[in-house]
Amino acid sequence: MAAGKKDVPCARGRWSVEDIRSSMLLYAVTDRAWLRGRSLADCVREAVEGGVTFVQLREKSAGHDEAALLARELKAVCAEAGVPFVIDDDVALAAEVGADGVHVGQSDMACEEARRILGEDAIVGVSAQTVDEALAAQAAGADYLGVGALHPTPTKPDAVDVTMDELRRICGAVSIPVVGIGGVDAASAHELAGSGVAGGAVVSAIFAADDCRLASAELARELAKVVAR
């Protein structure tokens, strides 16, 4: 690809709140550390076939060229399945490869700036741990919130804990979809019942599994029993 040339964006217009909400049931966040040498694209394809409805590329150890290659591979997998694909934190990479959007944390680029760079059609998700952060993100134009960590997790050992009561308060305070993250697995999914979340975000419960397709199918079944619809 010629230097400075961007990929074609995913071929669709603005995602509505309901489009995004309906795609939040099982939100997969990648981490190759769990794959034991398996291909990330193959594992994501299996996960989508099993029931994953949204994919975030989060590979902090990857350099730019490797991350761009992974992003293009996952974009193709997700586009074929009609599943939204966003990139963690790296707004420039999301613009370069034509991802559906980006997910930013409280210490990352501001939501408004990410929107300015990626355009009005992009999905911009924001992490939040409190009602104040959630309301500020919604006011800034966030399309959805990732709230957690709900349980201790080896994926992000330094993550701020969010209680189930706080999760319920956040869901009740905003009108945009909320996905709960942090130690969510098939055994704990029932704890999300009544919280108001649109789904659960999962890392190791999918990518550490021997069979990503079967793990995703089980997670999707359990989450479908409890999420707000």
Question: What is the meaning of each model-derived region?
Answer:
Residues R32, L150-T153:
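A short, flexible beta-alpha/helix-coil linker loop
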Residues A2-M109, R116-D143, A159-V162, R169, ...:
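Conserved N-terminal beta1-alpha1 strand-loop-helix module at the mouth
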Residues V147, V179-V184, G200-S204:
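Glycine-rich beta-strand-to-loop/alpha-helix junction loops that act as flexible
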Residues D108-C111, T153-P154:
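A short, polar/charged loop-to-alpha-helix boundary motif
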Residues S195-G199:
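Internal alpha/beta core interface subdomains
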